[in-house]
Amino acid sequence: MKKLLKSVLVFAALSSASSLQALPVGNPAEPSLMIDGILWEGFGGDPCDPCATWCDAISMRVGYYGDFVFDRVLKTDVNKEFQMGAAPTTNDAADLQNDPKTNVARPNPAYGKHMQDAEMFTNAAYMALNIWDRFDVFCTLGATTGYLKGNSASFNLVGLFGTKTKSSDFNTAKLVPNIALNRAVVELYTDTTFAWSVGARAALWECGCATLGASFQYAQSKPKVEELNVLCNASEFTINKPKGYVGAEFPLDITAGTEAATGTKDASIDYHEWQASLALSYRLNMFTPYIGVKWSRVSFDADTIRIAQPKLAEAILDVTTLNPTIAGKGTVVASGSDNDLADTMQIVSLQLNKMKSRKSCGIAVGTTIVDADKYAVTVETRLIDERAAHVNAQFRF
């Protein structure tokens, strides 16, 4: 049985090193691996000893914490219906019979959409308070940065197409978008911002060199969106440090997307994650491989902020946006005609929808190398609900 357990854990550890896949599971035996300190010797006494004191029971560890999520499995968390203008019909020809001015409930193209890519990289300081070489209470303080990419439907990219309203009357018409642009890509990069986490880990059961342990962790961060890219043939644009409207319904203010816009706020993403895990390790001299399972929930909430396409406050050369003509036929209609804006996408906007975990369960495999019972380095890989790698280097005082 011992040989089988050794084989399984060693294989798992070696596999993790060869396939790097935002919270780590960690080694379940970590509270009891470093039993000596660089400044004070370990006590290693009995908690039931009446002569033992809290000074004997408590020790500190500090170190580096690096967590690198290459692909978190996420999906949107939105309602089934979305409020916007009515879709054009076959009765509409060169332009709309009736320009949309009121919102109607339409199927939400963002409902249940999967994100194509979600990355997060964290570098932090690690601090752990150890009790009786069995329990750890720890925290991390550092910085994180992220990247998100998905189909434009996930971000409710919408615009107005086919309007017959004259350009001279457009600013006062209070029209709403009627087209969902679902065949495009939206990506965003966040800035590097403060991140923190807290957690606890316990070695629940020990038998010889084997240890079964459990942990619970919570992490939080709120990065701002540094750059937003919309890759769409009908309306392609990039915004650095985007701002938008929170809680605003269509129509947005006609100044949205211009330098004169008011009532906007910076686009930021509130990241929360909590995780519970159970893991098994087996010590082989200085190596302690382990394998674990975890259950976690993560959310990325940007308050459903609506961000408008950049445009000019006043037309220059009869142009306010750089959106191309779409029909690809006919002649350019003179400015002032009824449908001079019908062939370009107008009042384009998107919103940053709330996202959550698409899969809650995952596995982690890793190994810890301990030197002189004072220093340790842990390398870990996580799979299924995310592809991630974790590195932790620490020492005991």
Curated annotation (Swiss-Prot):
The keyword Transmembrane applies. Its main location: membrane. It is a multi-pass membrane protein. Coiled coil: none annotated. It is found in: Cell outer membrane. One of its GO terms (cellular component) is cell outer membrane. Residues 1-22 form the signal peptide. Keywords: Cell outer membrane, Cell shape, Disulfide bond, Ion transport, Membrane, Porin, Signal, Transmembrane, Transmembrane beta strand, Transport. Pfam families: Chlam_OMP. GO terms for biological process: monoatomic ion transport; regulation of cell shape. It comes from the Bacteria. InterPro entries: Major_OMP_Chlamydia. GO terms for molecular function: porin activity; structural molecule activity. Belongs to the chlamydial porin (CP) (TC 1.B.2) family. Part of a disulfide cross-linked outer membrane complex (COMC) composed of the major outer membrane porin (MOMP), the small cysteine-rich protein (OmcA) and the large cysteine-rich periplasmic protein (OmcB). In elementary bodies (EBs, the infectious stage, which is able to survive outside the host cell) provides the structural integrity of the outer envelope through disulfide cross-links with the small cysteine-rich protein and the large cysteine-rich periplasmic protein. It has been described in publications as the Sarkosyl-insoluble COMC (Chlamydia outer membrane complex), and serves as the functional equivalent of peptidoglycan. This is Major outer membrane porin, serovar H. The lineage of its organism: Bacteria, Pseudomonadati, Chlamydiota, Chlamydiia, Chlamydiales. The gene is ompA.
